[in-house]
């Protein structure tokens, strides 16, 4: 399912492509990013190269490269990946999906992730011919990442539950907090803004 390009003010979301493998590789070697997302799997560079080259054609998911939207003389200033946002586990019967976000370190806390999520939610809940017409978008966020939890809450995600001690954090444990936003909650939030 090749994702559509989703343009915004600060960021432009486009399908992940083979040349993005280098930046994805960097992301997988960011210790703090790995810690905050609970990523424990390791991958070879060849696996990342292969994945980046083929992920746009995989069913049941949309994987976008988050890129800067800045323009100069009618051209994009950069098309470099600064983060990745994913809708996966898309279930057309229950009209639900899972959301995942990862930003490269230099781009965290600057509003890029917020805008990327807003664009993906607009696409996910759009009931027009170009939207997914989803009813629910869920995610997991680790308790060691309160900044991400606050971001998701500010975008309308509601805490549904907690998986206690679900991830290792060095010698400690971290809970996985399950959050979601439903289509009526999303529409009410958009009307209110």
For every predicted segment, state its role.
Residues 136-141, 153, 158-178, 190-191:
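Conserved catalytic-core motifs of GNAT/GCN5-like acyltransferases
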